[in-house]
């Protein structure tokens, strides 16, 4: 079917791009945010594609205060922590977008992994999310 063909193509392209023989694949149906707070991944690079539902949200480096990530938020929600100044700073991917999220595990990128989160999911809304990682 179309989904399995697309997943196979995405995996092939990911492996070719990064010259790896295998990739860790996760295909997940979600009815709540998997990662509701902004964070960065401790991997070299993660491929993310949302097939249905709201897609991943992210922030550019020039709009954030990284000291407010994790414990630095002092338990505050993202919008109150001082991580970013306004809601207009939040960028949103669209369903079907293929994104390569560079993480802190990328050589030379240890302090600047892409800051992102799962979007809020409305009642009765579901997401179908594919992620690929190096293994």
Task: Describe every region a protein language model picked out.
Residues 24-28, 49, 100-101, 129-131:
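A structural signal for short, well-ordered beta-strand segments and their strand-loop junctions
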Residues 32-95:
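Catalytic core of non-heme Fe(II) oxygenases with the double-stranded beta-helix
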Residues 11-15, 37, 45, 116-119:
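Intrinsically disordered, low-complexity boundary segments flanking structured domains
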Residues 1-29:
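Signature of the catalytic double-stranded beta-helix
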Residues 1, 18-23, 71-74, 99-105:
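N-terminal start-of-chain detector that recognizes signal peptides
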Residues 82-135:
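Catalytic core of Fe(II)/2-oxoglutarate
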Residues 14, 18, 51-54, 103:
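Short, well-ordered alpha-helical segments in soluble proteins
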Residues 30-32, 53, 104, 135:
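Generic structural motif
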